[in-house]
């Protein structure tokens, strides 16, 4: 950090969308000297409208605007990971990886270089200081809460981040944009899904992989009996029911994917239930608040399945998660995030 650092300065990640636009307004209202930065992570067909929107907003607010091209890094660390995980028969979580290992670390790095203490985004999350550590907590809008994706942030980031959107609903954010005359931002549609893969991921894999990388294979039941042909194992995920292309007059789900044999195992829903799992690449904000406790909630999908659990550290440096009730469709590669009430305690990647 340069000696010129100032606690009233903030570097704001700006996508040109509604959330980061209102975040800039709110930070200015709070007395911060804002600098906007737009990361060039991925551009579909050279679409740079988001850059122009962010630049125009900064010009209107009379704040500096920077762009930072990280497309090569994003390709190597996020997109290639996404493709490789599906080719390994896993279910990837690119937004978790991007936030914890790319976006927020980049904000810190550039802030340090510029002598700016704070950095911020338009994420719908909050922050709280508990027992000597900062923690991410859920945003007040349950439909927009993004805390699930931020379990891996270290203290050096948590202690300097600003989160102006955490106490607002999306409806109120749109109202603020309209009230302040930022009508384009107020009416922008929310981005859905993975930023670089807005279409079905299967189409994306076909586009990105060499011809012949994905070949037809076979569905089997749990007893090893052949059921039908499938289009290629990367096109299926654990727990999937729709889109299998078969009619057995009963509900069947993907239970297991065997990449080496291009096999997909199908079963009934009950067979997908598990009462334990292991995590790698984990991060815990404060081990004293998480390990060996019986009041921890684990979530394995964004805004979906949650259950009480007990978490223990294993000799091989993995986390063992004992579920108090079964969960279905626990898939390798997915993220698991730990909570107590609204506080994020950590998380990891399911093995």
Curated annotation (Swiss-Prot):
User: What are the recorded GO MF terms, alphabetically?
Assistant: ATP binding; tRNA binding; tRNA-uridine 2-sulfurtransferase activity
Q: Key word Repeat present in the record?
A: no
One of the GO biological process terms: tRNA wobble position uridine thiolation
Role of this protein = Catalyzes the 2-thiolation of uridine at the wobble position (U34) of tRNA, leading to the formation of s(2)U34.
The record's section on Pfam families has: tRNA_Me_trans, tRNA_Me_trans_C, tRNA_Me_trans_M
Active site location: 98, 195
Subcellular localization: Cytoplasm
**UniProt: ATP binding residues:** 13-20, 39, 122
**What PANTHER family does its record include?**
MITOCHONDRIAL TRNA-SPECIFIC 2-THIOURIDYLASE 1 (PTHR11933:SF5), TRNA 5-METHYLAMINOMETHYL-2-THIOURIDYLATE -METHYLTRANSFERASE (PTHR11933)
Enzyme Commission code(s) on record? 2.8.1.13
The encoding gene: mnmA2
UniProt entry keywords in alphabetical sequence: ATP-binding, Cytoplasm, Disulfide bond, Nucleotide-binding, RNA-binding, Transferase, tRNA processing, tRNA-binding
The UniProt entry's sequence similarity note says: Belongs to the MnmA/TRMU family.
Q: Where is this site: Interaction with tRNA?
A: 123, 334
- InterPro entries per the record? MnmA-like (IPR004506), MnmA-like_C (IPR046885), MnmA-like_central (IPR046884), MnmA-like_central_sf (IPR023382), Rossmann-like_a/b/a_fold (IPR014729)
**Catalytic reaction(s) noted:** S-sulfanyl-L-cysteinyl-[protein] + uridine(34) in tRNA + AH2 + ATP = 2-thiouridine(34) in tRNA + L-cysteinyl-[protein] + A + AMP + diphosphate + H(+)
Q: What class of enzyme is it?
A: transferase
What name goes with this protein?
tRNA-specific 2-thiouridylase MnmA 2
Please state the protein's primary subcellular location: cytoplasm
């Amino acid at each position: 950090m340069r000696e010129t650092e100032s606690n009233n300065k903030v570097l704001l990640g700006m996508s040109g969308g509604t959330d980061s636009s209102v975040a800039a307004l709110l930070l200015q209202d709070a007395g911060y000297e804002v600098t906007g930065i737009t990361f060039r992570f991925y551009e579909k067909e050279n679409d740079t409208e988001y850059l122009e929107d962010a630049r125009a907003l900064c010009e209107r607010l009379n704040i500096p605007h920077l762009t930072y091209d990280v497309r090569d890094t994003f390709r190597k660390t996020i997109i290639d990971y996404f493709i490789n995980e599906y080719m390994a028969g896993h279910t990837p979580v690119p937004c978790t990886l991007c936030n914890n290992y790319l976006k927020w670390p980049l904000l810190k790095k550039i802030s340090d270089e510029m002598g700016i203490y704070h950095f911020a985004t338009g994420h719908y999350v909050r922050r709280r200081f508990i027992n000597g550590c900062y923690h991410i907590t859920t945003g007040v809008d349950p439909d927009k809460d993004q805390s699930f994706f931020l379990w891996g942030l270290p203290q050096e980031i948590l202690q300097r981040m600003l989160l102006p959107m955490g106490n607002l609903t999306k409806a109120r954010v749109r109202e603020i944009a309209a009230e302040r005359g930022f009508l384009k931002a107020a009416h922008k549609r929310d981005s859905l899904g993975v930023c670089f893969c807005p279409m079905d991921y299967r189409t994306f894999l076909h586009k990105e992989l060499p011809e012949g990388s994905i070949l037809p294979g076979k569905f089997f039941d749990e007893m090893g009996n052949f059921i039908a042909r499938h289009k290629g194992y990367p096109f299926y995920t654990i727990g999937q029911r729709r889109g299998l292309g078969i009619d057995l007059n009963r509900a069947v789900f993907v239970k297991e994917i065997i990449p080496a044999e291009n096999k997909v195992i199908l079963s009934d829903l009950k067979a997908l239930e598990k009462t334990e799992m292991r995590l790698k690449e984990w991060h815990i904000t404060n081990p004293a608040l998480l390990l060996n406790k019986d009041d921890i909630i684990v979530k394995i999908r964004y805004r979906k399945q949650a259950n009480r659990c007990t978490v223990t550290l294993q000799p091989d440096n993995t986390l063992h998660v004992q579920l108090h009730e079964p969960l279905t469709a626990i898939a390798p590669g997915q993220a698991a995030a730990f909570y107590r009430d609204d506080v994020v305690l950590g998380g990891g990647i399911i093995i």
